Structure formats: C-alpha cells, structure tokens
Regions:
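Polyanion-binding surface elements
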Residues: 2-37
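A sequence-composition feature that detects small, non-aromatic residues
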Residues: 11, 18-21, 51, 81, ...
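Helix-turn-helix/homeodomain-like alpha-helical modules used for DNA recognition
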Residues: 68-101
C-alpha cells in the first residue's frame, strides 16, 4: 500500500499591523512609527509604492519590506550610515527566511 502526502505551504506577502506587533513583539505604536519610516523610504526610492497598502482603516505592509527595514533601520535613519545599508533584494531575503529554496 502506498500513501501519498501533499505538503501545502502558503506565504502571504502582506501582513497587518496587529500581526506585525504580535510576530515581532513590539507595540502598535512602534509598528505605526516603522510604517511611517518605511513610507519615507518609499519616497526615497528604496521600496516600491505597493510596500504599504492603506485602504480606510486597513493597513497592510509587505512582509519582506518590513523585515528588510528592521534589519537596516539604524543605518537608514543615519544620513551618514545609510550608504552602508544592504540593498533591498526581495528574492534573496525570501530565501533567507525560508520562503523558498
């Protein structure tokens, strides 16, 4: 007798404010501050405009963008150190967090 199993993995590229706060163990106030800072990075060209989606009371953030921002936040906030921040390459970051091989 053969048994066939199927593993199904789902990765959603966007995450809500509440889920960010829960997953990263930070307050909603900290999440809102980081979203504001990410929007500034969108204006500077680091991230695409769809990195943060806002529709009414719903705010979703691209998961990979949030992780990248957390990794590079201190450098990006310092005008002298920001040139040393690693470039944002979503495919490499996705591999690093195990989304795909």
């Amino acid at each position: 007798m053969n048994i066939t199993t199927i593993n199904y993995t789902r990765a959603c590229p966007y995450i809500s404010r509440a889920n960010i706060a829960d997953q990263f163990s930070i307050s909603l106030g900290s999440v809102d501050k980081r979203i504001k800072e990410i929007k500034q990075e969108i204006e500077r060209g680091r991230y695409k405009t769809n990195a943060v989606i806002k529709d009414g009371g719903i705010v979703l953030v691209n998961y990979l963008v949030f992780i990248d921002y957390e990794i590079n936040r201190q450098k990006l906030l310092d005008s002298n150190a920001r040139k040393y921040a690693e470039p944002y390459i979503p495919s490499e970051l996705a591999k690093d967090i195990g989304w795909y091989n």
